[in-house]
Amino acid sequence: MLLEQIWGFLTAHPISVVTTILIVYLIHITLKPLNRVRRLGDVGLFFGKPELKGFYRERQLERLKLLRRVGDMPPVFPNGWYCVCESEKLANNQIMEITVLGQFLSLIRSESGAVYITDSYCPHIGANFNIGGRVVRDNCIQCPFHGWIFSAETGKCVEVPYDEGRIPEQAKVTTWPCIERNNNIYLWYHCDGAEPEWEIPEITEITDGFWHLGGRTEHEVMCHIQEIPENGADIAHLNYLHKSAPPVTKGSDIIKTDLSDPQPAVQHVWDGKWEVKSEEDRHCGVMHLNQFMTFWGYKVPLTSSKLVAEQHGPGIVHMLFDFGIWGKGVVFQTVTPEEALLQRVRFRIFSNIPWFFVKFFMTVEAMQFERDVFIWSNKKYIKSPLLVKNDGPIQKHRRWFSQFYTENSPKMLKDGSLSNQAKSIFDW
């Protein structure tokens, strides 16, 4: 009887039902935090007109990698901390495969919630912990092939289940230093085996629960890692590449956007500077940026923002925002070198800013970032650029960034291979 009444209502009021469903759906997607993910080839690369699809697209991507002129590049894996996972993506008692520094590793969360990173291959006969391995005894991992058990903390084998004899001394898996900070998990890498040389600052507003996750974006970018943070010192490009407002023009696609328009209808106006934080914190570079929007040359009220972006080493940026009456927050930009010329870039915002403003801000930020992706994915690295007076402190930034390269930093050879493989500081 009830089903008949429901069916009768649906058939009698189809427009009302469809409208209600549409409204509920729109509310859902509006309130849902932004999760914008772009894989390699989704943005930044040109696949012809008409655009290539499927197999032909993949083949063209391989050709682009092969034929692109990369230039005289610095080493490909600088020393520092790298984000390998967002905290909420790793559950207790889980082993997760991660890609970083040109290799697969195993990210582990124990039953009690601690995080560890180890090499992925069992030293017994070489099985992969990521494929069928499991967490046991709180903080140990068990190989899926023969059941050998290793401490995720020390890497040592603690049990061979079918043999009661003495465990071989060399039965050990390599571990990597890691830390969980600001709802991200980071790995420490140093090509000379040095212990962590600085700490990642803790944002107390996140720890104390005053700021909450409001959205994220993730991009795969085909370039050298140094190209991305160098943007912070390249002040001149802001008022050209990022001048027009993406939602009003052609979004992120610079092929379809007339960047030479001297007076876009809606325009971002930028002003900033970059400098080394201090001699004591020489691993940290700071960019101060002021921005507002104009409409036909007139400043738009309530669009002003001030940004202090602190870059901690080669792969972490903390962007501290003050939006005035809208509130405050931080955007984490993390750059992780998965391969020599493949970076995974994540943006995550934590704030007390209203949800609708956060979603708008992160969407515009992503579109602006994707304009840079078009440049990075197709440019070559020039060791000695031809700079003019108002280009900004690009050379100063390069001298600062060079501290993260040392004698054993892996270099990309002419055939595309690496001079040496990245390894844990515990392998020295």
Swiss-Prot record:
Gene3D superfamilies for the chain: Naphthalene 1,2-dioxygenase Alpha Subunit, Chain A, domain 1, Rieske [2Fe-2S] iron-sulphur domain
EC number: 1.14.19.21
An example Gene Ontology biological process: cholesterol metabolic process
Pfam families: KshA_C, Rieske
Membrane topology: Single-pass membrane protein
InterPro entries registered for this protein in UniProt: Cholesterol_7-desaturase (IPR050584), KshA-like_C (IPR045605), Rieske_2Fe-2S (IPR017941), Rieske_2Fe-2S_sf (IPR036922)
Transmembrane region(s): 6-26
GO cellular component labels: cytoplasm; membrane
GO MF terms, alphabetically ordered: 2 iron, 2 sulfur cluster binding; cholesterol 7-desaturase (NAD(P)H) activity; metal ion binding; oxidoreductase activity
Function: Catalyzes the production of 7-dehydrocholesterol (7-DHC or cholesta-5,7-dien-3beta-ol) by inserting a double bond (desaturating) at the C7-C8 single bond of cholesterol. This reaction is the first step in the synthesis of the steroid hormone Delta(7)-dafachronic acid (one of the principal steroid hormones in nematodes). Dafachronic acids bind directly to the nuclear hormone receptor (NHR) daf-12, suppressing dauer formation and inducing reproductive growth.
Similarity comment: Belongs to the cholesterol 7-desaturase family.
PANTHER family: CHOLESTEROL 7-DESATURASE NVD, IRON-SULFUR DOMAIN CONTAINING PROTEIN
Protein name (Swiss-Prot/TrEMBL): Cholesterol 7-desaturase
Gene name linked to the record: daf-36
